């Protein structure tokens, strides 16, 4: 696989099921000219009752599928359980270690940052 990032590639989004579709809808609303690929891992849903190490592997598999199979230029982890088991900065570092400098965005950090801002005012 080439380590070149296709700037015309889609934004890849994954979740353990269908809940991340609300995140996908928000991305579409904010970036209407971008292509989106969504993977809902319904075969292993729900993640909440799974061993965290298994969830880490699921997240890795889904991220690599988005990069390898769909040539995603960015990844959104729309699953709180996956982002807690494999923090987005770790996933981003793993991709970068293979020469893939792809932004990985989660949903936990933005929510926590919003809470911090709201409680400091």
Predicted regions and their residues:
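Non-catalytic structural scaffold of enzyme domains
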Residues: 2-121
């Amino acid at each position: 696989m080439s380590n070149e990032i296709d700037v015309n590639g889609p934004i890849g989004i994954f979740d353990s099921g269908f809940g991340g579709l609300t995140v996908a809808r928000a991305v579409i609303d904010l970036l209407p000219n971008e292509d989106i690929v969504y993977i809902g891992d319904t075969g292993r849903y729900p993640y909440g009752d799974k061993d965290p190490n298994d969830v880490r592997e699921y997240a890795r598999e889904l991220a690599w599928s988005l990069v390898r199979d769909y040539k995603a230029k960015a990844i959104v982890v729309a699953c709180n359980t996956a982002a807690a088991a494999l923090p987005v900065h770790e996933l981003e570092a793993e991709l970068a270690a293979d020469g893939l400098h792809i932004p990985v965005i989660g949903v936990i950090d933005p929510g926590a940052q919003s809470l911090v801002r709201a409680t400091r005012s």
